[in-house]
Amino acid sequence: MKYKGFSKKELKKVYSLIYSSRKLDEKQLVLLKQGKGFFHIGASGHEAVQVAAGLNIKTGSDFSYPYYREQAYCLTLGMTVEELFLAFLAKKNDPSSAGRQMPMHYGHRDLNIVSQSS
């Protein structure tokens, strides 16, 4: 059975990505208020369009240049929640920059996600 061209499995994946991004955003805000992070710009409300955009990227051949609110987009491209937390907390295992880049400036060499600068 399909809904607007999407299978039940595809819709569950989309919902899971949107939900994960929202919960990640909420947790990052809590950590910021606890003094465990130093910068956060929320992405809540942007998730659906970011997931839709991410699903139309050819992973492995297309390059992406996300801006600071595109957390759901990066999740859709294959970044994990753990990798996004490593970036947010500026940890050495952060795939974006080994903890040297400003948080919310996503990058991932293996996924062709190019980090921005500010």
Model regions: which residues?
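Cofactor-binding active-site loop characterized by glycine-rich and histidine/acidic residues
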Residues: 23-118
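Cofactor-/ligand-binding subdomain signature composed of acidic, glycine-rich
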Residues: 1-39
